[in-house]
């Protein structure tokens, strides 16, 4: 096998060109660029299309690009196509993780998330087995095309979108359709529709949802509701006197809704979430250098590559399930993160110390480092959503994941230009640094998530109280004038 394919799953391409360090490094970054774009654009795509649509259409796109790649004989064209494949793959993975965190019960979220993620390890072992038995990568890709297409169809038929995300985006039509879909899947569609048509509670809820989508009418309705007392004549005077202020109230309503929707800039602006973003971004970057580095370095280990790759993915499968138990136990998310990051730091330090003395020990600790690192990764996924308020959770996660993708772009250059022994020392330092940084994080296990950033909530409450005081003051003035009349 030539050095060209050090970072590729393909082992039988031949283009007759010579290899160099820069070329090897660039080849290693191509897949990571697709992952980087998938993480960076994820919050935009999710806000526009919803998680269910991403899972369906991107599975189909993933299958289509895999199918196209089979017919390309040029190695470099293939790598460009593979970049798009990784883009679809990362968006699919992100959507799956987000949907799991939003539709699963809080008590069992981490355990179910870990069980679902363990499918990545099973998929890796299945891929290694297929490649070992079939040998020809094209036939392996055909199996991948079929599996991806079937997965997309199953998701389209049997899954519903995240109700939380529909409410955050003020998309009440999608929210209603998802409720109807859930009723249909449980065989209660007729009962649901009859309830909407006949039950006053359902009608009122549906009417409220429709009112929230009409900004221009919301302020007058609020005034009518607030002033529905026995003093009808006084209320008419108050309503007419406040008509001049209605445009201002409408603008405030729109600004308030805009703030509640959330953005990445809000995370950078407010300190209560900014420090979480920075710490998790550093942690994900460090963890990802080890994640991508251990995958690339598997071909340099002693023994059969197929055996080593199978053990690597077996470690992934075990790690996801182990992390679910630890993070959901009394240890909690924060302490679990510290234990796993410190563990892989120690394992990498041992590999650095014995690298030139005993290769068998290096192989053993190599898989131990992989096991503990994947355990930490799985806790990251749950912790990221629980630590951010709901309004900005997708933005925070997307930024953290983007930082992890940057590690995938950088690590091939580090491995190519730095001696392998000292790469393990870098991993060890990263593990210790992350462990120390996590002391500044807060525990999230079993705690309800906040709807909005704390500072924004305080600002909105102040404005609301100020507006109520002004309304009361104006009301007293108008009532006193009315009495004089």
Where are these regions (language model features)?
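Central cavity-lining transmembrane alpha-helices of secondary-active solute carriers
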Residues: 29-43, 310-323
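Flexible cytoplasmic loops linking transmembrane helices in multi-pass membrane transporters
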Residues: 1-22, 185-296, 301, 461-485
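Central mid-sequence intracellular linker of multi-pass
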Residues: 135-224, 428-467
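Glycine-rich segments within core transmembrane alpha-helices of 12-TM secondary carriers
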Residues: 34-35, 89, 93, 104-151, ...
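C-terminal transmembrane bundle
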Residues: 82, 86, 117, 284-287, ...
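Helix-breaking motifs and short loop linkers at transmembrane-helix boundaries and internal kinks
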Residues: 50, 71-76, 134-135, 354-355
């Amino acid at each position: 096998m030539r050095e060209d394919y050090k970072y590729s799953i393909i082992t039988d391409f031949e283009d007759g060109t010579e290899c160099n360090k820069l070329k090897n490094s660039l080849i290693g970054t191509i897949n990571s660029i697709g992952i980087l774009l998938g993480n960076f654009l994820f919050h935009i795509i999710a806000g526009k299309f919803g998680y269910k649509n991403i899972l369906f259409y991107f599975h189909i796109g993933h299958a289509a690009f895999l199918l196209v790649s089979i017919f390309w004989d040029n190695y470099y064209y293939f790598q460009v196509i593979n970049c798009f494949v990784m883009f679809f793959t990362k968006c699919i993975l992100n959507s799956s993780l987000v949907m799991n965190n939003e539709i699963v019960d809080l008590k069992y979220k981490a355990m179910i998330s870990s069980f679902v993620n363990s499918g990545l390890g099973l998929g890796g072992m299945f891929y290694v087995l297929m490649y070992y038995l079939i040998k020809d990568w094209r036939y392996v890709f055909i199996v991948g095309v079929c599996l991806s297409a079937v997965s997309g169809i199953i998701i389209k038929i049997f899954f519903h979108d995240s109700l939380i995300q529909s409410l955050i985006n003020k998309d009440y039509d999608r929210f209603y359709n998802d409720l109807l879909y859930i009723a249909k899947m449980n065989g209660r569609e007729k009962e649901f529709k009859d309830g909407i048509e006949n039950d006053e509670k359902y009608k009122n809820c549906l009417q409220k949802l429709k009112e929230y989508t009409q900004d221009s009418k919301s302020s007058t309705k609020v005034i009518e509701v607030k002033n529905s007392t026995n003093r009808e004549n006084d209320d008419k005077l108050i309503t007419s006197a406040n008509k001049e202020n209605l445009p201002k109230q409408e603008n405030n309503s729109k600004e308030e809704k805009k703030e509640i929707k959330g953005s990445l800039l809000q995370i950078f602006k407010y300190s209560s979430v900014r420090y979480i973003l920075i710490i998790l971004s550093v942690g994900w970057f460090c963890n990802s250098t080890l994640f991508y580095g251990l995958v690339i370095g598997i071909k340099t280990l002693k023994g059969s590559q197929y055996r080593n790759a199978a053990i690597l993915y077996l470690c992934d499968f075990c790690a996801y399930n182990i992390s679910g138990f630890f993070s959901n136990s009394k240890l909690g998310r924060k302490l679990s993160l510290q234990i796993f990051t410190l563990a892989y730091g120690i394992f990498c330090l041992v590999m650095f110390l014995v690298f030139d003395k005993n290769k068998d020990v290096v192989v053993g600790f190599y898989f131990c480092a992989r096991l503990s690192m994947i355990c930490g990764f799985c806790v990251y996924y749950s912790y990221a959503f629980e630590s951010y308020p709901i309004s900005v959770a997708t933005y925070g996660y997307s930024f953290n994941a983007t930082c992890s993708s940057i590690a995938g772009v950088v690590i091939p250059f580090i491995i190519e230009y730095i001696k392998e022994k000292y790469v393990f020392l870098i991993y060890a330092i990263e593990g210790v640094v992350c462990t120390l940084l996590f002391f500044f994080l807060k525990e999230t296990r079993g705690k309800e998530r906040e709807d909005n950033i704390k500072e924004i909530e305080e600002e909105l409450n102040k404005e609301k109280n100020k507006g109520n005081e002004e309304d009361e003051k104006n009301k007293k003035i108008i009532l006193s004038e009315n009495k004089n009349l």
